[in-house]
Design a protein with these regions (language model features):
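Acidic/aromatic-lined carbohydrate-recognition and catalytic surfaces
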Residues: 1-157
């Protein structure tokens, strides 16, 4: 096993990209990305950081709908493993943003675990009016369930 200091070097070039940045009609995004990196960047990019690739509903992949399934247009887990061959792979672990269709939110709305513990309802507080953000959508979204209407933080709207 590598020592922690051997995992990264200041000389590494890191390619940061979305899985579908390289378009090749009819080819899953991760396969097209692997082909492009192998053909053009193999000698340079020691690390490929693939921005959110899990199944999502919006927000550039950050509104995660499933933490176990890849976005179908990107390919599947074997495509991600193939991209990792011969290089280091980096990914965002998006736990603090989920889609309303994510199982945790659906469980929260039914007052079931684990969603009940994963989604936090907001406690009304006048200080929320002081939150400044670069979005026009509401800071909170109302969800209805067995406990009635509850407000949850909405990062992206």
């Amino acid at each position: 096993m590598e020592e922690p200091m051997d995992r990264w070097a200041g000389s590494y070039v890191v390619l940061i990209t979305y899985a579908d940045t390289i378009g090749d009609e009819g080819v899953p995004g991760l396969q097209a990305l692997k082909s492009f990196v192998n053909r053009h960047l193999h000698a340079f990019a020691a690390v490929v950081h693939v921005l959110p690739f899990l199944q999502s509903t919006s927000d550039g992949g950050f509104a995660v709908a499933s933490h176990t399934n890849l976005e179908p247009r990107f390919g599947d887990w074997s495509d991600l493993a193939a991209l990792a061959q011969g290089r280091r792979l980096m990914a965002d672990l998006v736990l603090n943003h989920v889609s309303a269709s994510h199982p945790w939110v659906q469980q929260f709305m039914r007052d079931e675990q684990p969603g009940r513990s994963c989604v936090l309802a907001a406690v009304p507080d006048p200080c929320w009016a002081d939150v400044v953000r670069p979005r026009s959508s509401s800071l909170f979204t109302q969800l209805r369930g067995p406990k009635g209407a509850r407000q949850v933080w909405t990062t992206f709207g």
